[in-house]
Amino acid sequence: MYPSAMSILTLKVNGRSQQVDVDPSTPLLYVLSDDLELRGPKFGCGLGQCGACTVIVNGQATRSCVTPVSTVGSNEITTLEGLGTAEKPHPLQQAFIDEQAAQCGFCLSGVILTAKTFLDRNPRATDEQIQQALASVLCRCFGNVRMLNAIRRYAGGRTA
């Protein structure tokens, strides 16, 4: 096995330019968690199938565990931490707080960031459309109506 060549890459993460010295084939998830110490995206399956590692890259929900860091280039990367702060959460994060929608929290990065990107493109989505958009995010507690209520609240306060 040959050692991989390291490269200094500049990433724009949560509105800040960050330089990292990494193997260009390293999954974005590892750079975000190990090098930049961001804990929003989680390692779930490592295959891009569960959604726990979801981040937003140029407005698109992206599975960071299967995205080589070199492919994001100078694109804007947003993690769950980049949406808001503890003092001033993003309205979707606040809706999850208000609805007490989080249980274990492992899937929250996937649920919240997927919902945000979907609703940014489809602000008048129906409950069925929202559920379809989130079908690729695995969550043992997504049957909990509180998550859907939080997403509805963010999308404009629709009721069931």
Kindly give the residue locations of the regions a language model identified.
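Signature of N-terminal electron-transfer/Fe-S-associated modules in redox systems
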Residues: 1-160
